[in-house]
Design a protein with these regions (language model features):
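Anionic-ligand binding region
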Residues: 74-80, 89-107
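Short acidic-glycine loop/turn motifs at beta-strand connectors
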Residues: 59-61, 94-98, 151
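Structural motif
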Residues: 48-49, 85-86, 90-92, 129, ...
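Mobile beta-alpha loop/short-helix "lid" or hinge segments that flank ligand
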Residues: 2-13, 90-98, 132-144
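Residue-level signal for inorganic ion chemistry
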Residues: 34, 54, 73, 91, ...
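N-terminal polybasic phosphate/anion-binding patch
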Residues: 1-49, 117, 170-176
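Active-site-adjacent loop/tail segments of enzyme domains
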Residues: 55-85, 111-113
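GST superfamily/GST-like fold recognition
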Residues: 1, 73, 83, 106-176
């Protein structure tokens, strides 16, 4: 399947903030963000299947954002150390201004107790790439060593529930 990645023209932080003020929980906020992303692209690409996805991280009722620098990544890893956190995912497909598929799931991730030396070495290896991930770790790289246990779909941890998505695309005869 050929595809094109198009950045959505939305203010994620503002949408997240507004939805939280409205009293919505992580699942609803993730869905609102995924829908807003897909909708912003779908408006410019009618008759096209547009996939929007979002992932939130919640630990002990605290919502995390992507770290903005290595120092904030360090602080985030210190807060996640030894804790179980949730990755809350939502993926939405829009075609012709209509949501035709939605999928949500939550993954529980337990992090090892991390000492400052391990965090420092990890950040030195990964560099600013950790700022692309809400958890400041990349499971597909050295970040796997930080985790004690994962309960959930591997692809969803990476940000896209690939197997359910492929199932939908096959059911719609888009994949053969």
């Amino acid at each position: 399947v050929s595809f094109q990645a198009i950045p959505p023209g939305i203010d994620e932080a503002a949408i997240k903030h507004e939805r939280k003020l409205d009293g919505l929980g992580p699942r609803e906020v993730a869905e609102a963000l995924a829908t807003a992303k897909a909708d912003s692209v779908a408006r410019e690409h009618q008759d096209t299947i547009v996939i929007g996805s979002d992932q939130l991280l919640v630990c002990n009722e605290e919502w995390f954002d992507r770290p903005t620098c290595l120092d904030s990544a360090r602080k985030q890893l210190e807060r996640l150390s030894g804790q179980v956190h949730q990755l809350v995912n939502s993926t939405v497909i829009i075609k012709n201004s209509t949501a035709v598929w939605k999928y949500e799931n939550t993954i529980n991730v337990e992090m090892h107790e991390l000492n400052s030396d391990l965090i420092k070495k990890y950040l030195a290896k990964e560099g600013r790439a950790v700022c692309e991930s809400v958890g400041a770790y990349k499971l597909e790289g050295h970040g796997a060593q930080l985790l004690a246990q994962v309960d959930g779909d591997f692809f969803s941890i990476l940000g896209l529930p690939l197997l359910p998505l492929l199932g939908f695309l096959r059911a719609q005869d888009i994949l053969r």
